[in-house]
């Protein structure tokens, strides 16, 4: 636990420096007491994945003294109304948690020039909009590499959610990571078309297992839990995409390859308080400590497998390994 908090503190410092911020903590915390911050989520904070870590980021912001609010399970068609509701309530900062919200957020933000918007996995940068890009492909690459190191059937599977850029990129990274380890491996990649059909994800995962997959890897928010459950029920291995997913697959889960977006949210908010927000879209991945390997749940994972995966993580962080997203 101590190491966990040391790592989190280090990540926040790295990201704060990425935003060009080194200002007095007392000033930031004093300023934060008068700030209202909202988070609009496409899914549920109970997903043990993307939305859960976003919410954890909001809690970090709350701990700095801000007044916070959040809205879960927001369809794109309702995002503009959610923005306007927070604007009417006097919110100063609005985080949009999904690439799916980009177009509606960019358009609606024009109505509220005094509100600062942060878009996740977006390429938009306007007067009152800043974006940072979580490197989902790196998470997928690590999942694929570990799956290839663990498989006994030479067949591994990735199940994504809605086929938006982050999930598509995660699937591309997964395939390239698996083939980085074993160019001859069989890789199955399929997206669900949604993030909340847990039963459908379980059925698809069981279909994968019937086709020879013995390591399952989800990147589907709430639906990821169905993939983990399928692994538990069929006796294959699973690599989680979020902390705590092992609770639904205690015998199947090997480890989580984590996207700890919470520290990115906190760093973005600190940049707002300091009034020093770079215009360019900032990458948030292995180099920034946002993508990392969690604690292993199984004691029988060979040390050489762990060492190989750590080496791949370092090569992603240094840029030695490049992922092709074309």
Tell me what each language-model feature is.
Residues 20-24:
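C-terminal motif of bacterial Sec signal peptides marking the signal peptidase cleavage site
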Residues 1-12:
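Bacterial N-terminal signal peptides that target proteins for export
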Residues 12-19:
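Alpha-helical transmembrane segments
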């Amino acid at each position: 636990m101590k190491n966990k908090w040391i790592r989190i503190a280090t990540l926040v410092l790295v990201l704060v420096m990425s935003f060009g911020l080194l200002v007095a903590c007392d000033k930031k915390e004093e300023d934060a007491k008068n700030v209202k911050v909202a988070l609009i989520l496409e899914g549920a904070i109970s997903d043990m994945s993307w939305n859960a870590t976003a919410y954890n980021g909001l809690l970090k912001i709350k701990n700095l003294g801000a007044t916070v609010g959040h809205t879960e399970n927001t369809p794109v068609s309702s995002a503009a109304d959610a923005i306007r509701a927070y604007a009417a309530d006097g919110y100063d900062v609005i985080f949009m948690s999904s690439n799916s919200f980009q177009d509606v957020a960019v358009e609606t933000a024009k109505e509220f020039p005094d509100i600062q918007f942060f878009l996740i996995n977006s390429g938009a940068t306007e007067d009152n909009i800043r974006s940072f890009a979580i490197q989902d492909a790196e998470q997928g690459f690590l999942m694929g590499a570990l799956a290839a190191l663990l498989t006994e059937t030479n067949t591994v599977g990735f199940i994504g959610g809605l086929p938006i850029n982050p999930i598509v990129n995660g699937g591309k990274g997964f395939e390239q990571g698996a083939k980085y380890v074993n160019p001859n491996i069989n890789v199955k990649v399929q997206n669900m078309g949604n993030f909340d059909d847990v039963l459908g994800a379980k059925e698809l995962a069981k279909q994968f297992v019937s086709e020879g997959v013995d390591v399952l890897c989800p990147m589907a928010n709430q639906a990821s839990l169905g993939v983990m459950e399928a692994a538990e029920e069929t006796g294959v291995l699973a690599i989680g995409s979020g902390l705590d997913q092992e609770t639904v697959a205690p015998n199947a889960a090997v480890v989580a390859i984590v996207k700890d977006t919470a520290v990115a949210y906190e760093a973005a908010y600190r940049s707002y308080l300091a009034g020093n927000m770079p215009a360019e879209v900032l990458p948030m991945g292995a180099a920034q400590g946002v993508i990392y390997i969690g604690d292993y749940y199984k004691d029988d994972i060979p040390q050489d497998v762990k060492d190989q995966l750590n080496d791949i993580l370092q090569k992603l962080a240094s840029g030695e390994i490049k992922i092709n997203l074309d």
